[in-house]
Regions:
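Short beta-strand/loop element within the Bergerat-fold HATPase_c
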Residues: 78-88
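Acidic ATP/Mg2+-coordinating residue in the GHKL
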Residues: 96
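Glycine-rich nucleotide-binding loop
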Residues: 89, 100, 123, 145-153, ...
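Conserved DHp (HisKA) dimerization/phosphotransfer helix of two-component histidine kinases, i.e.
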Residues: 1-45
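Short conserved segment of the HATPase_c
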Residues: 101-113, 167
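Conserved polar catalytic motif of the HATPase_c/GHKL fold
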Residues: 62-73
């Protein structure tokens, strides 16, 4: 089901879904991002709580990588990834110490080709993140932090990514 939803959200690689747990998925995601990116200070906090079986797909990982990569581009010295549970949802928050979002960028969040990077094809990362999250019944919120920097929060209902219960 998750693969089908992700395929319809724009994932066309057709890679198989993997059965895992939320904690294992986000721990592996954080470790892979850390090991494949040059980042002086990457803070990772996994406060998800009691683990939950889930189905993961490369699109879920790429969705978070897009946000982390944007944060690294804006704040090459410091990025934080925090994972928590909000009632029946997985909440993934990426924080940076960069200049924050321009007001017009926040107003047009989710519109394709909105980017501060001024390069061809830019501005699709957050657009794809929003589409995948919405397809799964989730949400994406972005804001500028009062102390500086930006924060992007992805919230996905656990029901959309949970493993179906085994039938007795």
């Amino acid at each position: 089901i998750v693969s089908g939803i992700l395929l319809s959200a724009g994932e066309t690689r057709g890679e198989a879904s993997v059965q895992t747990t939320v904690r294992t998925f986000v721990d592996a995601l954080a470790e892979e991002w850390r090991s494949t990116r040059s980042m002086p200070q990457f803070i990772y906090d996994n406060d998800f709580g009691a683990d939950t079986p889930m189905v993961s797909d490369t699109t879920l990982q790429q969705m978070v990588f897009n946000v982390l990569d944007n944060a690294r581009d804006a704040s090459p010295g410091w990025v934080r990834l925090a994972v928590t549970r909000n009632a029946d949802a997985l909440r993934i928050t990426v924080t940076d110490a960069g200049p924050g979002f321009a007001p017009d960028m926040l107003a047009k969040l989710g519109t394709p080709y909105q980017s501060s990077k001024n390069r061809p094809g830019g501005g699709l990362g957050l657009y794809l993140v929003l589409n995948v999250a919405r397809t799964l019944g989730g949400s994406v919120a972005a804001r500028n932090r009062p102390e500086g920097g930006a924060e992007v929060t992805i919230e996905l209902p656990l029901a959309a990514i949970a493993l179906p219960e085994a039938k007795a």
